Amino acid sequence: MRSKTFTTHRYGAAWTLALVMAWATPGARAAHDTDTIPQSVQAAMARANLPLQSLSVLVQPAGSGPAILSVAPKRAMNPASIAKLVTTSAGLDLLGPTYVWHTDFLTDGVIRNGHLRGNLYVRGGGDPKLVLERIEAIYAQLQAQGIRAIDGDMVLDNSAFALPKHEAGGFDGEALRPYNVQPDALLVNFKAVILRFVPQPHAGYATVEVEPAMAGLRVPKRVRLQGGRCGDWHQALRADFSNPRHYRLRGAYPRACGEQEWPVAYADPQAHAKRALLGLWQASGGQLRGTVRWGHVPAHATSLLRAPSLPLGEVIQDINKFSNNVMAQQLFLTLSPQQPATFDGAQQTLAAWWRRTLPEQPLPKVINGSGLTRQGQLSAAALAALLQHNLRAPYAETFRQSLAIAGIDGTVKRVGHQRGEAALLGQAWLKTGTLRDVASVAGYVRNTQGQWLVVVGIINHEPARGGRAALMQLLAWAAQQPTPQARPH
């Protein structure tokens, strides 16, 4: 998967300074009870058939001052993906924004006349974003060392993580959705295959491009075009991705859709890295005489190349802006003190960090670091306290830039363009969460006075469909509220 290009909006130290000034700026006390749910939010929840009792909210000034809105803020709720804010905050605090993971390439042989006379070992270190173009660059470096052909095997080692057995699709039955991919110490391209459809109108078909090149996977090179609206083009293709050796497209692609991409979790997760790394090696012009297999790096192996990941400060942009589940879980496992890393170890590290950082707040229940669970627990008050803490942290700006900007990017790119949301456009830095029984949002909102607010809203109800619209109304309402004057001490 080609890595995304992020549009960054850098206010630098000026943003933090503005927050500090906002904390000290008195404002008029809001003319409403702090526990009264705004009418616009109530109306949106009514339209979605959501009971008001399913809502937990805390809206407060950044830094200090009385709450503007407080509705059951201490109730333990399933946060869904806003739990990623806990994971990324702990990662920044414990590892630092410049932290990198490493993928090691080693051998038990020698290089002679363009041949690696031995095995090539690839040892994963948990890199959350070992994607197509980075692997291509690594292979170019190996070839620059004189390796054109590997006479032995390509041996893959992912022993840095010890993970429980995972049933693909066990969470919600959607085994081929990339958000359900399990973490892996040697995670290649998010264990996904990307199909790109490019219409050729004069020829009457769309070409089908595949990334990454997957050894042993057959994919149709083209699919016929059809007229009409774009609509549900996924359904129109009548795709079958269940066979990890052969993808089938029995339908047609709507001409009106233009170019589109379809990311699919590979049906045989254990074989994904093997097929992808071999396919990319062959696509680079490299040869392999042996096979690709899982194994362990022997003690006597010598290093050929150590490939660093992107720094953590950049990685968390994917995690928070785009809510990448498997990347969040990779980071979470990195917090585990023991080797191989485990979820239990990561949970213990996170708990100890939380007790040091926010001792007055109840410990959240973070299962896997991503929020993709039915068992997670976190209160709006506790998350608001974390967001307040992060404003004073050395990594405040890095954390803020990892959040999606309303109307600009990430999961809230469309926010601010709907009726009643104009005040949010470019004025809210947010993380959202969605499960069938959860809708959630958390982050920073700048009100019409130019002052910053911390906002957390969580809805737990099955189904929670329509909850996001209610939470957007909450954010829009918050943006219109004056900051209450801090109480005298």
Tell what function each PLM region has.
Residues 220-241, 302-308, 418-447:
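Short, Gly/Ser/Thr-enriched beta-strand-loop segments that form substrate-interacting elements
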Residues 54-56, 113-187, 191, 200, ...:
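Mid-domain, small-residue-enriched loop/turn segments at the edges of structured enzyme/sensor domains
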Residues 29-63, 69-76, 136, 141-145:
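Beta-lactamase-like hydrolase cores
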Residues 65, 79-97, 154, 186, ...:
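Active-site SXXK
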Residues 93-108, 289-292, 396-399:
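Short, well-structured active-site flanking segments
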Residues 68-71, 332-489:
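Small-residue-rich helix-loop
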Residues 227-398:
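A small/polar active-site loop signature that marks catalytic segments
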Residues 12-23:
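Bacterial N-terminal signal peptides
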